[in-house]
Amino acid sequence: MSAYLNALGLLCALGQGKAEVARGLFAGDTGGMQPTPGWIPERQPPVGTVTAPLPAWPLEWTPFFSRNNQLLLAALTEIEPQVRQAIERHGPARIGVVLGTSTSGIHEASLGIAVHQRSGQLPDGYQYAQQELVAPADFLARYLGLSGPCYGLSTACTSSARALLSARRLLVQGHCDAVLCGGVDSLCGLTLNGFAALEAVSESLCNPFSVNRCGINIGEGAALFLLTREPGPIALLGGGASSDAHHISAPDPSGRGAVQAMQAALRASGLQPGDIGYLNLHGTATPHNDAMESQATHQVFPAGVPCSSTKPLTGHTLGAAGALEAAFAWLTLDPWLNPAGQLPPQRWDGQADPALPRLALTDADSRLDGRRHAMSNSFAFGGSNVSLILGATP
């Protein structure tokens, strides 16, 4: 059964909305990645902050206020007419909500704990529900008056990629007629300092797949799709998932789990490696991830595939990254937003790591060559791996 991504709302360091984000994506715009003090003591790493104006928060929804939900509401605003039409067509019980996140409410919880440490009491109006991982999905369902399946997924950096796979299963199994799916994550000090403690944060713009790579940049963002059976221009053809069970934070260096996920995605989509016209790499610019992903990509695509990491443009948006980068694949395949068939260019210093297989990294002149399928990879702590494949419909 085909599942179509029939509406897309998104915002990140590249901007807000499909048109603005597409312009920045295909220009390789890194201007949203700015050195930012205040997150990590005595450091100013580049951070991908959403600077677009966010909707005023409705007073009646004050108990649900968080930065995550603000970003989510902004993404919803872009596609709300299509969502309301789906609710009218199918009814609120037949619309599901599946969202991925990893920082849901952590910032609000940190602020509350800080007040409690000083005063012995939580601040007035503090809501424990703000820090639940299901909070974004719960807010969205309540806001829209939906009563279909509603849940959140949190598998670190594969969270929202898994949300898209889970949403597709809800359609295939007949539990829903439409699903709002995607991911959202916002910046928070606990997360940034946690990565800093792992010595994984770069002091400069991240440099994926370079011999000089030295760590990640963190960003925030939201991407929200309306997934339905009604035919549309872009389909979620399938996906694959695997688990390394290798290490709590490091990937299996052989790339075994990543290979399994990519091969499973190809099988589920009925495609061969040569059918993929663009691969969005996870490409965090850490020594371990990029080494593993280079090996895995070479195993699955021995003849090569045009590919790039978009992390230098947005930062690593963690639980939102899978959905956000699926959105980048969506924009790449959309002939209206990308009439020239541009591919997102790789932004790096151009110095390949001689210890790794050479990848066919894109540049400003790279174009789709007629193959209308794109794969997006997401790999996470704990060895969680997800690959998604999107396709442009004839």
Feature names for model-found ranges:
Residues 1-5, 65-81, 87-92:
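N-terminal amphipathic, basic-rich helices that act as targeting or association modules
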Residues 1-62, 101, 229-239, 327-347, ...:
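ACP-dependent fatty acid/polyketide chain-elongation machinery
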Residues 2-8, 26-37, 42-46, 201, ...:
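Condensing-enzyme catalytic core mediating Claisen C-C bond formation in acyl metabolism
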Residues 7, 25, 97, 140, ...:
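Conserved small-residue
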Residues 13, 103, 156, 284-286, ...:
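Glycine-rich phosphate/pyrophosphate-binding beta-alpha loops
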Residues 16, 108-112, 190-194, 246-249, ...:
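Short acidic, glycine/serine/threonine-rich loops at helix termini
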Residues 33-77, 104-166, 175, 191-193, ...:
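Conserved catalytic cysteine-centered active-site region
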Residues 85-96, 114-125, 139-149, 172-179, ...:
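Structural signature of cysteine-dependent C-C bond-forming condensing enzymes
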